[in-house]
């Protein structure tokens, strides 16, 4: 077997010096056996398997901990802009017997010379959606659909809202076609009735051919002479460096006990022990510059996931359960059960932002809801860098009442209590017993998005429930927060992470650095000097009450010689021209 393998590699795999730039990069693929769990564990008992020296079970950032880790799937990153992969083939072969035995083949050599080895391929169709892929796009291919624990096809792609991921299930025959040479599979007979993809952990090889037959990705995988070695049936091989067109089989691929399906990879540095995160910024920057405004409007900064009967960091009032133990607390509430209840924090990314009539939409596993903002004048002109906290509990119940004090220098935080009907007109939820004013934050894959008064999406999903989240698992004794400086383009792809050591309601986030364990504080400096201005609301009904009248005139005169929503002609100054526009609409809806 070893002699034959060496001979075939010599024929199929080019030398390192001949490797050329590629439009697609293999970023990750799932080698977890269908009856096993990521990291360790087999059968039902594996659900809570904890490996020696670790405090929790290993998980995937998208699906958590599931048997089989989502079935067979492979993930690509588009490394060259405007890539056309119509007619491309992804070819795979399993060259060594697994611990459960390989499938029985029909002897057909679909592409690999030995038809007795399990092999197959899938081909991208001529569908136009494959003709112009943008750099930085993540493409996952799944064997199983959602009902079977995998994922159905979803080609949504909205980079200006942070969505760079497309998933294709092999059942989507208009997008892909697949074949293999299996006659039977005694170890997993159910797979014979599904889509044709099989990923093994021992000496599983893959290559990608362009439509003209040239190699886009030469043969790679365990045993092909590259860096990948010793993949187990509990593991996921993944790229541990940033994707570029020059990635090849000799790049830093390694097996891992965690995975990040549909999101950039993360790993622990073997030297420093620090958590590292794959960056797509270099690939995506030109695309964002072409398609999107450099200035987003608003971003999620932090939210509370601590359950009402638990403390931040767990433990008791006197001591948390962290290592080493301490007294984890919030900067506003101190160390209290529930850490202040349901709350989240936003940061304004563009100056003079008008949020009147906006709807904030939250979701978690099984539940969702909305927070409808009123047309109060307060929402009509929010300044860049403002921190806005939303909280359900009043001060009397351990939360905080509305406080809109703000001076732009020493005080840049406002608090909105969602029971305040002057600011929040309505909240909704499909949770039993919901009453208006209530909302939820939690550790159950929670996320938040926003729509403006017209219903247009203005903030894509952000939080641990967003597909591109690749921080630590948020548990019921954590907050989730942005572990990075706030920037004009901050979206759901930014580095969000869990924290059970501290939270900072209404303040800049903090975190512990690595490898030097010092406290780092979030900076707003880049944001505040960005010059980002929110687009004008475009109408003279400045208070949004449905009629242009004296109240709107008062708002305009109060903004005289300044900027903001009252700059109706968008020339940068509120002056007589804007007054003329307002008076010309007097008594109308605007």
PLM segments and residue spans:
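Activation on beta-sandwich/Ig-like modules and their edge loops
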Residues: 20-202, 208-251, 255, 292-444, ...
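Cellulosome-associated attachment modules in secreted, modular CAZymes
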Residues: 532-590
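Generic structural signal for beta-strand residues in well-ordered domains
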Residues: 13, 17-19, 67, 337, ...
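Compositionally biased, intrinsically disordered low-complexity regions
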Residues: 7, 15, 214, 293-294, ...
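A recurrent domain-boundary module in secreted/ectodomain proteins
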Residues: 248-293, 496-538
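Sec-dependent, cleavable N-terminal signal peptides
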Residues: 1-22
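Intrinsically disordered, low-complexity repeat segments enriched in small/polar residues
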Residues: 5-8, 12, 193, 206, ...
